[in-house]
């Protein structure tokens, strides 16, 4: 854990939104999101810089899947904090990677794996439900082994609308696991198909991964759900697993502890 009580900044830069969190002792004190495009635009910077005014921050740890904004973001961030750590597969310390092409692993997925290992133990599975659904698997020894990438809920709903003439566009926010599996209208039928199909896809993939892990280890497997759509599945069979909305930010917090020499683990 952290030897001092200074807060620091964690930032998860995604394709559409960047998520900010001010963290102290692995507790998130404040968090907010801004469009990722604003990080690479000098005219839009104040939308996130204003939130940091007056904050005493020991540094920043961030991950990014939008490399085009990183340079401008770091340039302006360096005026606020002096210690900036950009998490990637080459400098990560919170986990060990056993993967043929580690540079292909999304940095947010690495942060999730760090959080899962340290908060829930290994072997571990992290299921992140965003634009895409990703599974990240850690062995009993704590090695990052690989995972699964599948379509997310918003891709399902958009694809039905884009590839047909008569099916309407339904926001992913309106989809949930249905009480009845018989839709009484086109929209209701689509909601059943997407909601039930989404949950079924994830449950099926999870079952297969659990079976493979249990064949290689007798230890209990921790399963953690995160991502914008994870809350929708708390009504399904997945409700028995851990749910952490801010898993990526917490993973960045733990990685910052490993990287910062002024902290004691």
Please give the residue ranges for each predicted region.
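Adenine-nucleotide phosphate-binding core of ATP-dependent small-molecule kinases
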Residues: 32, 176-219, 240-242
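N-terminal glycine/serine-rich phosphate-binding loop of ATP-dependent small-molecule kinases
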Residues: 1-93, 265
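A polyampholytic, Gly/Pro-enriched intrinsically disordered region
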Residues: 103-114, 168-173, 178, 261-265
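Gly/Thr-rich phosphate-binding beta-strand-loop-beta motif of the actin/hexokinase/Hsp70
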Residues: 1-29, 116, 122-144, 160, ...
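Phosphate-binding/catalytic loop of phosphoryl-transfer enzymes
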Residues: 83-85, 91-164, 195-210
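Glycine-rich phosphate-binding/hydrolytic loop that grips phosphoryl groups
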Residues: 165, 235, 241-265
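Short beta-strand-loop/turn "lid" adjacent to the catalytic site in phosphate-handling enzymes
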Residues: 50-105, 141-153, 184-195, 199, ...
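Short hydrophobic alpha-helix segments
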Residues: 32-34, 148, 253
């Amino acid at each position: 854990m952290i030897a001092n009580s200074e807060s620091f900044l964690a930032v998860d830069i995604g394709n559409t939104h960047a998520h900010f969190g001010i963290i102290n002792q692995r507790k998130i004190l404040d968090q907010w999101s801004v469009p990722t495009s604003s990080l690479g635009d000098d005219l839009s910077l104040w939308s996130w810089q204003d939130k940091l005014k007056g904050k005493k921050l020991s540094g920043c740890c961030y991950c990014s899947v939008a490399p085009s904004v990183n340079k401008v973001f770091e340039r302006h961030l360096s005026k606020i904090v002096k210690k900036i750590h950009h998490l990637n597969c080459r400098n990560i310390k919170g986990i060990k990677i056993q993967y043929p092409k580690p540079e292909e692993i999304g940095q947010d997925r690495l942060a999730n794996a760090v959080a899962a290992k340290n908060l829930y133990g290994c072997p571990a599975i992290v299921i992140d439900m965003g634009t895409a659904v990703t599974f990240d698997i850690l062995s009993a020894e704590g090695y990052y082994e690989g995972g699964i990438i599948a379509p997310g809920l918003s891709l399902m709903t958009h694809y039905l609308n884009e590839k047909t003439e008569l099916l309407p566009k339904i926001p992913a926010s309106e989809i949930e696991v249905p009480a009845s599996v018989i839709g009484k209208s086109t929209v209701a039928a689509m909601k059943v198909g997407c909601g039930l199909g989404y949950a079924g896809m994830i449950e099926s993939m999870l079952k297969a991964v659990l079976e493979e892990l249990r064949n290689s280890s007798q230890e209990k497997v921790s399963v953690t759900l995160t991502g914008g759509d994870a809350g929708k599945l708390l009504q399904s069979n997945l409700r028995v697993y851990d749910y952490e909305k801010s898993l990526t930010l917490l993973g960045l917090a733990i990685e910052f502890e490993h990287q910062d020499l002024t902290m004691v683990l």
